[in-house]
Structure formats: C-alpha cells, structure tokens
Amino acid sequence: HIMRRRQRQMCIRDSWNIQGVTCSVRVLKDLQEKLRRGNWGITVLLYYKENTVPEIVDIHSGYSEIPAFGVAIDLGSTSIAATLCDLNSGKIVGSMGIMNPQIRYGEDVMSRVSYCMMEEKGLATLNNSVIQGINELTRKIAEKHGIKLDSIFEIVFVANPIMHHLLLGIDPKELGQAPFPLALSDSLTIKSKDIGIILNPESYVYTVPCIGGHVGADAASVLIAEQPQKLKDTTTLLIDIGTNAEILLAKGEEIFACSCPTGPALEGAQISAGQRAAPGAIERVRIDPITKEPRFKVIGCEQWSNEKEFSENVSGVGVTGICGSGIIEAVAEMRLAGLLDANGLIGSSAQTGSNRCTSSERTNSYLLYSDNKVSLSITNMDIRACLLYTSDAADDA
C-alpha cells in the first residue's frame, strides 16, 4: 500500500508538480481496472483546499476532460435557489428553485426555532425536511440539463444563521434569544454524504461563513460580490431582501450590518399572484404614465411583452405569476403612473382613466396580464403587504 501510494504521488508530482495526494478506498478500488482500460493512462480529478492535502475524487481511463459540476445554493427561509456551474469552464449551466419544504413548520425562522424547542424531534424533522428539498432540487436541475448527479463534486451554501444551523443539524434555539451566539461562524468543508446530500460520494459541501447574530452567509456573499469598501468616498446601503431583510451600510472600509424579520411577501407568499423567482415569473415591469398600459419581462424569456417575438418565445415557460423584483417594480410604476394615491390605494377606473383598474368587494385591483389560462392582477392587499415589508426594512435601516 505504501509503495502504491508513493507511485501515485510520484506520477502526479512529476506531471503536474503537485506534492502529496490522498484518496478514499472507494476511488482506489477502481484504479487498477481504469489503468488497464486506459492503456495505463488515467485522468484524475483533484479536490484541493488551501492548506490541505489534495484529494483524488474521481478517476477516468485514458486522457480526457472529466465532467465536473458544482452547485451554488441560496438556502432561504421561504425558497431554495440553485445555480448549476460547469467547473471546467466556469460557465453557469442553469438555475432552478423550489419552495423551502420547512415552511409547513413555520413561515419565518423564529417560528422554526420555536418548533425545535417545542417538539421532541423538531430539529431532526426540520433538518430532514431541508435535506430532502435540496436533494430534490439538485436532482431536478441535473436532470433538466442532462447531467449525472455523480458528476457534481461540490455544493456551496449561503444562508441566514438559523437556516445554516438547521442545514447542519445544529440546534438553533440559542439564536432565538440574546446574545444570539452562533455555534459556528467560520466556513465549513465536509463531505456531502455526511449530511445526507446525494451527489458524487466524494463530493464536498462548503458553507460560506456567517457574519454574526442574525446576519448570515447570504449577506457576506453580497459584500463579496459588491465590494462596497472599494468605494472610498461613497456611502452605500445594501439590502438583501428575503423573509428576513439583512441590511449593510458601508462607508469606506467601515461596514455595519443588521437584520430584521419582514415576512415572505416578496418570495411568493402573501401576494395574490406571487411566486418564487422561477421561469414564468414576471420579474420586470414598466407602466406607461399616459396610457396606463403595462409591459413586462418574464424569467426565461429575453423579450419584453410588447415586442413581436414575445408571444412565441414565452410559450415555453408561460406567464405564471409575479416574483419579488416584479412586485417591487409594479408598485413603483403604479405610483409613478398615477394608479396609486399617497396612501397606496389603487384608484377606480374612473379615477385613473384605465379600464385595467377594476372594483370588486369594495376594493380595487390593476390587471397586469391575462390570457386564456391565467389572469394576474395587483390588488390593494398586495400593496399593503409590500408596504408592511418595506416599513419593517426602513425601520431597521
């Protein structure tokens, strides 16, 4: 065994100047057969993390590019969004999302903390629920793009602290009371199989570190992406909108962070035509201030709704609802077009001069889109849900 290990290390060292490698018994079992099949030539896939020994996670016969994919997951309280990436090219293959199955046990994170405290097997139930949801999501996105789960070697998570703890099976009850201590605030790299995620058996999970309190890895990722500290003489306010809003105020290299519960209004819940951000969801809205006619963009279609090619190109995904960014723009555009008064109430057809404004049961609504399958309107209750959301975020800011 020692001689074989030395030979393996010498081959990789001499060919690629990589010092020292390791691999699991599962990978080692296939080595001899794949060497012979490849005429004594093989291609290995190495997983390498700084300050660790490189690990062989896959072997192919001969000399070829090993299909290698990774998944980035935003684990939200209401929805789970996944982006599939080709690790060889760095290109994004596709995205997909599902509702977080934990929502049946509580709409927000604090209700899930309460569930863990009140139910004997509450933590295990919530952990199993989210792991099953992640496995379903990765299976669906892999199937959609014709990729084997065995070709996915890394999965990266960002989440708020409570979702982070529930993912790892860590009791979050201490996060339900001051001073909100985290069990783990650093990054973590573990085998996917150790927490029940079904990918390649040698694949790894990497969790982005949380900042602290209720400001999580999702907010940390926003800072990494936007890098507001580079804008030396500018004050920047960043808001990560979700069931919890995380707010970051940056001035030079000083960055202040806080979070507040705001509810799931912008993630598909509490909005009459609301849905998560997925193909078919209206994500952009513009309303002509003179004609009061809307135009919009749908996730999965490049054209605006007033362009000629829209009807043909949108047929594959359809128009199914409106997501968070869409409802924000719709409310703003309705106000600019004179469809809303200062209190956020939708005017009647006579008041606005638009037949799209209709009255029903002593309340008004604005028709955004309709066809023979679906009718999507913005109602006064939708406006109120958005106002409650933004007031919570504004108070925190």
Question: Predicted regions: what is each one?
Answer:
Residues 320-338:
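P-loop NTPase catalytic cores that bind/hydrolyze ATP
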Residues 335-391:
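A contiguous, well-structured pocket-lining segment that forms one wall/lid of small-molecule binding clefts
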Residues 120-128, 209-215, 237, 269-272, ...:
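Hydrophobic alpha-helical scaffolding
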Residues 1-8, 12-14, 389-397:
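Single conserved hydrophobic/aromatic residue that forms the stacking wall/gate
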Residues 108-123, 199-206, 370-385:
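Gly-rich Lys/Arg/Thr-decorated short loops/hinges at beta-loop-alpha junctions or inter-strand turns
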Residues 5-9, 13-168, 173-177, 206, ...:
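N-terminal glycine/serine-rich phosphate-binding loop of ATP-dependent small-molecule kinases
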